[in-house]
Amino acid sequence: MAHKKAGGSTRNGRDSESKRLGVKRFGGESVLAGNIIVRQRGTKFHAGVNVGIGRDHTLFALTDGKVKFEVKGANNRKFISIEA
């Protein structure tokens, strides 16, 4: 005979899988063409010289070189470029 009242069930216990966003190659690091520099949602960082942008706003290197972060424009936008 049970001496404990039955416990109810919970409706919690779920979470989405992390998307691993963020900067993958930092300023001054060497990259090869095709290397992913940043994975992001929206354009937190904008594509500069020798940097391409994927349809999910991923920034990637178009040429070999070094990563350079810079802030430009009236809106202080962050740009990422590749210096050959």
UniProtKB/Swiss-Prot annotation:
The keyword Ribonucleoprotein applies. It comes from the Bacteria. SUPFAM superfamilies: Ribosomal L27 protein-like. Residues 1-22 are annotated as: Disordered. GO terms for cellular component: cytosolic large ribosomal subunit. Keywords: Ribonucleoprotein, Ribosomal protein. InterPro entries: Ribosomal_bL27, Ribosomal_bL27_CS. Pfam families: Ribosomal_L27. GO terms for molecular function: structural constituent of ribosome. Gene3D superfamilies: 2.40.50.100. One of its GO terms (biological process) is translation. PANTHER family: LARGE RIBOSOMAL SUBUNIT PROTEIN BL27M, RIBOSOMAL PROTEIN L27. NCBIfam families: L27. Belongs to the bacterial ribosomal protein bL27 family. This is Large ribosomal subunit protein bL27.
